[in-house]
Amino acid sequence: MPPKAAGGKSKQIQASKAAAKGSSGGAGRKKWSKGRSREKLNNAILFDKETYAKLLKEMPTAKVITTAVVSERMKCNGSLARRAIKELLSKGLIKQIIKGHGNGVYTKAQ
């Protein structure tokens, strides 16, 4: 097979690709976007008497009770919310619907 003639098609393609690479973008490198930050929640780590009374009054009447719901309504952290759910369950005020590995879904006991 004889050698290819200089200035073949592949050389032209490579030259056009190199030109396209050099002139793309115009603005240079893309900048990193600023990450959105949420405000820090100052949730309680212990129940005081008023909050505990509110827990015993409000939570057994809720339709859906999860760790997140208790934490949001009572303004307590997640571990305290899990303990509160365990206590309500042991007192028979709520019943379990779904049991997961880390969390569960509960509802009012009628």
Curated annotation (Swiss-Prot):
The keyword Transport is assigned to this record: no
Q: Where is this region: Disordered?
A: 1-39
What the entry lists under InterPro entries is as follows: Ribosomal_eS25 (IPR004977)
Taken from the UniProt entry, a GO cellular component term is: cytosolic small ribosomal subunit
Q: Which domain of life is it from?
A: Eukaryota
A GO MF annotation of the entry reads: RNA binding
Task: State the protein's name.
Answer: Small ribosomal subunit protein eS25
| Species whose genome carries this gene | Dictyostelium discoideum (Social amoeba)
Instruction: Please name the gene that encodes this protein.
Output: rps25
